């Protein structure tokens, strides 16, 4: 039986099915609904709100060190707060699987910037997984756990606003219980002194090479990466929600290499794919993260010179900029209602900000959502 779910609801289901035991999060659109949907699995998954993203990351990583599969979620600007433990975890590795959700927000629907957190995976030298629809949001959690434990790495699980909030049919599976060995003290692995970090860095680089090979082989078998060959005239390399747009826009016969494991890139697979098409496009939102690496490998491709660096993509934009077709925009002569952002219903800060709004003297506040107060 299939269920109609948002990407966030499906991710929560994926947490349950993957045998994850611990989940900690700090709320922030577009990621909030993941933890909100986990209490229904409370008999199998312990979940809690953390006071900030750094604490959420440390709670989950502590559970991983102890041997449990763990998961933490935050919006993309929250990863700035959590960067300290994340980078260190990249050197130390994991016990049980350790998954960190970063929900990016192209077009700034609910955020103060448009930062592209894919760069964090590259900087921290950890694996990154990107689902493109609700079914993959569920399925890829288990695959991310496989990657994490197989390669001893944290996994950055990157979604976007449209992936989080769009809905699709999701087919459920059964929970797979994860049994872990009892905690064993390992100072060299989990105490990141300078000497230990120095010794671990070569292992991190070796891990990236093994992940690249995995992306070319096993990831094709389990569906994390997908190859769809057409007539060989046009090829598209894409990931995340951009795949859904490209699949709808490009004509029949187009070849697609859809990447779910987007760091490190499976460059041998990409090079082989590029050799089989006459013209290669790289379709991605925000920064030319994949495009720059592909061009650096000496593979000619077309990307950001057409799609641009700003805002989220959509089907009309791709038709206009990539295919040169006239966009079929429809407008109405009605001014939209003014709807400034507001604090979410049930937010404990609503009363505080209401009180502040009634005071005329100067006030200074430091809450992230202060702009909504």
Language-model features, listed with the residues they occupy:
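Thiamine diphosphate
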Residues: 1-134, 160-162, 229-230, 253-256, ...
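RNase H-like, Mg2+-dependent phosphodiesterase core
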Residues: 373
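Flexible, low-complexity linker and terminal segments
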Residues: 1-8, 18, 131-343, 348-352
